[in-house]
């Protein structure tokens, strides 16, 4: 099935000052910030942050879960189970393979806007949340963003989480703040912060068993006996991004209910 993105999901909302947005793009281009000059990239990030789960096809097909697959990626392990059934049976709402750090220059006010929202809606913060994945502080008050996020070019998730009141109000707050255009907010930190605060830790899952490559990084399961000696995976664990200093997977494993992969 193929569909078109509704025009209103890929255009400027009425409250955005397009001259100010253009000035931001020019400054970011001069500063050599990745995608800093791109107008289309910003529309893409806003769409993936706030509208993909509202696409008419997702309703027409009666979808409850989704798997984001981008052009040019490689799956390097046999997927011999149904990830959607796994998510449903284990009450998972968000799954990922790779995590990394965001470029701070692209999101100067994303965290402060998040704190404003959390202060306004403390009841939305999950009781057993994964806050420590996105901040090194012990409480949200006075905290800073540690820049960790799930790399959203691979996501398996529950559409009902994104369609829920908590997430939609969070996105609406961010959208009105204008940072998708006045800065260069990505959908990865938006999804990651939302999942870490609005979901319980047990609802987030690292798909270690799925080898995945999206240039320039890859995730490859480390257990050779379980995944490689039997030919299940074709990747090299030595090339996995998991143990790179720029990866946040080790932090996630320390917080997750499953712990580090065996």
Name every feature range the model reports, one short phrase each:
Residues 1-63:
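Active-site-proximal specificity loops/subdomain of glycosyltransferases
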Residues 59, 73-234:
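Catalytic core and acceptor-binding pocket of nucleotide-sugar-dependent glycosyltransferases
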Residues 63-64, 72:
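Conserved acidic residues
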Residues 11, 16, 112, 247, ...:
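Short linear interaction motif-like sites in intrinsically disordered regions of transcription factors
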Residues 234-262:
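C-terminal helix/juxtamembrane-tail motif
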Residues 6, 11, 63, 107, ...:
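Acidic, low-complexity intrinsically disordered regions
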